[in-house]
């Protein structure tokens, strides 16, 4: 849902064109979320959802960051958010398509705020890290970013991804028991093997660039879930270590502890889990400002 009390076309042409990409086949809950004020352009944040999810995954964070004074953009990633929960659109998702979209989102955010933050979850976390490597944004917060699969060793992930691309695409259920009965309120109940492999190609490119150059973002906070079941925490720590060799003072790793075995810690469908993680994620994206204490001498 776009929140606005002015002409987006007049002030933010790129943003208006992005919103227009939400065609009739996109579900109401799958549409790009925009919460902006015409009178405030100090801070903007882009929130990037995970694979097969939709912008509604970040609805609560979008609301709270807007209340904190941010202009907020939660874009619908390419080929996501269709009204048909069994849409085959993801099988056509490509790595260059995702990267081009992120470039567009960052440029839009620069129209919305002088200081830009990008945060994202899972595949959105991967894209956030990719943006952190390339763009001089103020802050980047990759949340449980997809740099590999938890049960596949890093050295094997590349060959596995390329093998997936040499065979026909397959769709797999996120929940093999519920299958299509799994709630699709925030996205598709399936993922595509080709989409997964193309996302990993972005991760490989990111790691190659990170070994050679420091991240362009002024501050990066990588967020990992200590009880992660899907993405590879070792790979997250590896990127953290690589980046810190370049800029140890501006890269940090925040590990969430005390959660049950889990991956999706942001979706409103898992409201108890998301509720526990929410304050930590909010503070990672918008850190509390130090309080100045006045002393009477």
Where on the chain are the PLM-derived regions?
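N-terminal cap/lid segment of alpha/beta-hydrolase-fold proteins
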Residues: 2-40
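Short, surface-exposed "cap/lid" segments of acyl-processing enzymes
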Residues: 27-80
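Serine-hydrolase catalytic core
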Residues: 38-39, 186-259, 275-295
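Short beta-to-alpha linker loops that shape the active-site pocket of alpha/beta-hydrolase fold enzymes
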Residues: 76-83, 146, 259
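Catalytic nucleophile-loop/oxyanion-hole region of alpha/beta-hydrolase
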Residues: 83-112
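Gly/Ala-rich beta-loop-alpha elbow adjacent to hydrolase catalytic centers
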Residues: 119-128
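Active-site nucleophile loop of the alpha/beta-hydrolase fold
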Residues: 141-152
């Amino acid at each position: 849902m776009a929140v606005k009390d002015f002409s987006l076309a007049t002030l933010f042409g790129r943003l208006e064109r992005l919103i227009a990409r939400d065609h009739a086949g996109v579900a109401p809950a799958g549409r790009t979320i925009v919460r902006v004020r015409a009178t405030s352009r100090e801070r903007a944040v882009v929130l990037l959802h995970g694979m097969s999810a939709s912008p509604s995954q970040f609805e609560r964070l979008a609301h709270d960051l807007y209340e904190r004074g941010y202009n907020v953009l939660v874009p619908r990633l390419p080929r996501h958010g269709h009204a048909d929960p069994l849409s085959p659109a993801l099988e056509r998702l490509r790595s260059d398509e995702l990267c081009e979209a992120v470039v567009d989102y960052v440029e839009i955010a620069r129209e919305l705020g002088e200081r830009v933050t990008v945060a994202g979850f899972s595949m959105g976390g991967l894209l956030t890290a990719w943006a952190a490597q390339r763009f001089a944004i103020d802050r980047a917060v990759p949340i449980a970013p997809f740099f590999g699969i938890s049960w596949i060793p890093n050295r094997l992930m590349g060959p596995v991804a390329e093998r997936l691309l040499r065979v026909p695409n397959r769709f797999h259920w996120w929940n093999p028991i519920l299958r299509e009965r799994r709630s699709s309120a925030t996205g598709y109940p399936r993922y595509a093997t080709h989409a997964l492999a193309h996302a990993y190609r972005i991760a490989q490119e990111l790691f190659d660039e990170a070994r050679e150059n420091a991240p362009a973002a002024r501050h990066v906070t990588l967020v990992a879930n200590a009880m992660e079941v899907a993405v590879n925490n070792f790979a997250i720590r590896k990127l953290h270590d690589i980046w810190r060799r370049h800029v140890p003072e501006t890269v940090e790793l925040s590990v969430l502890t005390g959660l049950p075995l889990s991956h999706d810690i942001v979706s409103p469908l898992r409201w108890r889990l998301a509720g526990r993680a929410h304050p930590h994620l909010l503070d990672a994206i918008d850190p509390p400002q130090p309080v100045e204490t006045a002393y009477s001498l």
